[in-house]
Amino acid sequence: MTIHKEGYRSLFYVSAFLFLLNFLIYYFFPEASILQKTVLVISLLIFLVVLQFFRNPSRTIEINDNQIIAPADGKVVVIEEVIETEYFNEKRRQISIFMSPFNVHSNRNAVSGIVKFFKYHPGKFLVAWHPKSSTENERTTTVVQTKNNEQILMRQIAGALARRIVWYIDENSKVTQGEEFGFIKFGSRVDLFIPLDAKVKVSLNQTTVGGKTVIAEFYS
């Protein structure tokens, strides 16, 4: 278990603030031992909570070109047929994974291939389960084309708490299934838009593990 690089700055600021807070408490209230201990315990709890937000467990990924794997840890909250209007302009199967603040927040490539389309959208910060969060919130859209010419759209969506999306890919870059393509600080949601003829292997409310859980399979 390591700490993700996206957490270094946040952890530094949190540590500095908590250190200063405890220093001031000890300095101005030298006799208030109960207050000192209470603030210290609360500070440690806050630090541990923030620390777990940025944990980055090591995972062994088994690449399978016939599978679409989970891009994030979380829970499946949507499985439905929709018309995807940003890129495909046709019917696709949408599978959405909600990432709580207590999930690992790194995002992984669902398939291997070439990035055919990428776009960042500034936007609102509606709660992740809001029906319009997929189209109105801050988000990124990434389309990867596999070697078999299947196209998968992955959408990172910021939420009410997650107010910063990070990505590590560009159009025409080559990506590998299971490798990190981005990070959403403090959770939120990742949507997948897959072909209608792909066989879905997950169910609503199922827990997913990024890079491990098989979301769907392409028909051979």
From Swiss-Prot:
Keyword Lipid biosynthesis appears in the UniProt entry: yes
Annotated site location: Cleavage (non-hydrolytic): 187-188
GO molecular function: phosphatidylserine decarboxylase activity
Localisation: Cell membrane
Keywords tagged on the record: Cell membrane, Decarboxylase, Lipid biosynthesis, Lipid metabolism, Lyase, Membrane, Phospholipid biosynthesis, Phospholipid metabolism, Pyruvate, Zymogen
Gene Ontology biological-process annotations: phosphatidylethanolamine biosynthetic process
Topology within the bilayer: Peripheral membrane protein
Reported modifications of this chain: Is synthesized initially as an inactive proenzyme. Formation of the active enzyme involves a self-maturation process in which the active site pyruvoyl group is generated from an internal serine residue via an autocatalytic post-translational modification. Two non-identical subunits are generated from the proenzyme in this reaction, and the pyruvate is formed at the N-terminus of the alpha chain, which is derived from the carboxyl end of the proenzyme.
Record-stated family: Belongs to the phosphatidylserine decarboxylase family. PSD-A subfamily.
HAMAP family registered for this protein in UniProt: PS_decarb_PSD_A
Task of the protein: Catalyzes the formation of phosphatidylethanolamine (PtdEtn) from phosphatidylserine (PtdSer).
Subunit structure: Heterodimer of a large membrane-associated beta subunit and a small pyruvoyl-containing alpha subunit.
Name assigned to this protein: Phosphatidylserine decarboxylase proenzyme
